[in-house]
Swiss-Prot record:
It catalyses: N(omega)-hydroxy-L-arginine + 2 Fe(II)-[cytochrome b5] + 2 H(+) = L-arginine + 2 Fe(III)-[cytochrome b5] + H2O. InterPro entries: MoCF_Sase_C, MOCOS_middle, Pyrv_Knase-like_insert_dom_sf. SUPFAM superfamilies: MOSC N-terminal domain-like, PK beta-barrel domain-like. The lineage of its organism: Eukaryota, Metazoa, Chordata, Craniata, Vertebrata. This is Mitochondrial amidoxime-reducing component 1. GO terms for biological process: nitrate metabolic process.
């Protein structure tokens, strides 16, 4: 309201208007500061954009979250990419872990039938299902009175809150195991994540994970899968390789050269290739481990350069590990841009 309007106002109306103006002053100042911050950010982004080239190299075709390590994936259409990987509501990538009573991780390498377990969320309840098993429901959040276990994932120490006896009994029944297993949950607000570089030294200090093998993000292209399957007598699926992000619209193994990528609002930095192990030989439909294919075939054409043998040993390379450079939302259908510096 302008001063001209106020100039003809009677005393009480003018006083009330001035009082309102005084109350609005802090809000107007805050709004001004906010606009300044936004303008500064937009200027910085513009300068960054001027210094970089974006080349579309593919499309996000799938986003997959694995709530429990070594169990089935949950496909989502949209996910937040946090420093610890993909998340969508209660779904957080590999934030649940099966361990022994001593806290040692249990994966499909030891219990191949883990790949048949599905973990979904119904409201504030984690639901576990497996073949010939009744569903077990675990209310969330877990009670703070539940004990916190000291666990080990590839020799690294990390904590997890125990989910209780009902889940433990369900796992023992499913695996028909005389050894008791526990299901634990990583609570990011009170527990310290693992550092990726303690598993693979090529990672950066800031790359952190909960219970994944090494990286917050693993990306694989559909065309790389097709190239592998063209060499196999019995085709395998993406489920054998457990990527978080699947790309399409590119040449086979193009992801090997995507050192810096943008997907939606998210920016990822390629760290290293994913060296493959015996876990890839677990059939995701039967839960049977063969220890043969597709690993044997991968070894015939996806070995590392001799200069990198110290890093990868004899593991064939399939898919790429990424660190999270900038968090944000990723959606199925988003373009995948390779980012390069100008000049």
């Amino acid at each position: 309201m302008s001063n001209t309007v106020f100039s003809g106002a009677v005393g009480p109306l003018r006083a009330a208007a001035l009082s309102i103006s005084r109350h609005r002053l802090p809000l107007l100042c805050a709004a001004g500061l906010g606009l300044t911050a936004v303008a500064s950010w937009m200027w910085w982004r513009k300068r960054q954009g001027e210094a970089e080239d974006l080349q579309q190299v593919g499309i996000v075709s799938q986003l997959l979250i694995y709530p429990v390590k070594s169990c089935r994936a949950v496909p989502v259409q949209e996910a937040e990419c946090s420093a610890l990987g993909l998340k969508s509501g209660h779904l957080e990538d590999r934030h649940w872990l099966v361990v022994t009573e001593e806290g040692n991780m249990v994966t499909a390498r030891q219990e191949p039938r883990m790949v048949l377990i599905s973990a979904t969320f119904c409201g504030n309840t984690l639901c576990l299902n497996g073949p010939e098993m009744q569903e077990v429901q675990i209310p969330l959040p877990l009670p703070k009175s539940n004990r916190v276990l000291d666990c080990r994932v590839f020799g690294q120490d990390i904590q997890g809150r125990d989910s209780g006896e009902q889940a433990s009994e369900w796992l023992a029944t499913y695996f028909q195991s005389s050894q008791p297993y526990r299901l634990v949950h990583f609570e990011a607000d009170v527990m310290r994540p693992r550092q990726s570089k303690k598993k693979e030294k090529l990672f950066r200090d800031k790359d952190v994970i909960a219970y994944p093998d090494a990286s917050p993000i693993m990306l694989l292209s559909e065309t790389s899968m097709e190239a592998l399957n063209s060499r196999l007598e019995q085709p395998v699926s993406l489920a054998n390789f457990r990527p978080c992000i699947v790309a399409s619209g590119c040449e086979a193994f193009a992801e090997d050269d995507w050192d810096d990528v943008r997907l939606g609002a998210t920016r990822l930095k390629r760290v290293m290739a994913c060296g493959r192990c015996v876990l890839t030989t677990v059939n995701p439909n039967s839960g049977v481990i063969t220890r043969k294919e597709p690993l044997d075939t991968l070894r015939t054409f996806r070995q590392s350069d001799s200069s990198l043998k110290e890093v990868y040993k004899n593991a064939p390379l399939f898919g790429q590990y990424y660190g999270v450079e900038q968090t944000g939302i990723i959606r199925v259908g988003d373009p995948v841009y390779r980012v390069t510096r100008k000049g």
